[in-house]
Amino acid sequence: LHSTSRRQRQMCIRDRGMKEMLDRNISFSLYMTHGGTSFGHWGGANFPNFSPTCTSYDYDAPINESGKVTPKFLEVRDLLKQYLPEGEELAPIPDSIPTIAVPEFKLDEVAVLFDNLPEPKISKDIKSMEAFDQGWGSILYRTTLPASKEEQTLIITEAHDWAQVFLNGKKLATLSRLKGEGTVILPPMKEESRLDILVEAMGRMNFGKGIYDWKGITEKVELQSNDGNITSLKDWQVYNIPVDYSFAQNKKYEKRDNTEKYPAYYRGTFTLDKVGDTFLNMMNWSKGMVLSLIHISEPTRHSLIS
């Protein structure tokens, strides 16, 4: 073992453990044989310090995320062959799913979220996302703030999980549950102003005490003046923003270049002569999601919304 690489040592230990169980006729399973992908917002999160996991569930499994066999798969297969009844053989390995390259295209249509909101739900008090019949996606809380000659501090308690704060449509701050952030300094306001808090739900903690992982703003939103007085904000308009292609598709899209500072849907289309698996390069990505709709025709037309 001393002359082998770390990966080779791990393989030796794994295969040795499997062989020992097979020699003793012990049943076992591999976690994971194929990890795959957690699509949408179905990813989990670690506990106690909230840490959402990515949508990739590859797990360095014998069958990788895209369904291809790995050297690990072949090694496990070779081991299992030794324990087959005489005359039996393992089934042949299926061919890999074909892959294709998508032609270059632009996300050249834009629908600004604040211009495309659904009908709001009215709530006296702040409530979690689940209270508004939504389990994942994003949710927008909106209320009106009174005029103030001085700066004030906005205190958001337990925003789960990633919040953007806007005042009269202008973005003031981003608050992350991962970093324990929850306060924003508000500038003086000459008149009543619109406060928007857009909260995105990320992975849910799925074990232990953290299993009751409500999303949205789960406790309260308060306004603190310079003299220390704290007021709980009431009278909210709440907008459900689900992770749903039809919701994103039925928006007013237009050619527009000045939306960088606003949450928005960006749409582009491309045409394929043949279909196959493909992969998005997310190296320059920041925050968001990708939805894809396939129009079956000849050739095939795809619409991508991010």
Task: Locate the predicted segments by residue.
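Extracellular and analogous surface-interaction loops
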Residues: L140-E150, T157, I185-K190, R267-G276
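Active-site region of glycoside hydrolase catalytic domains
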Residues: L1, R6-Q10, R16-I26, S38-W42, ...
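A cross-kingdom feature marking solvent-exposed beta-strand/loop segments within repeated
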Residues: K72, E150-E151, D161-E191, S297, ...
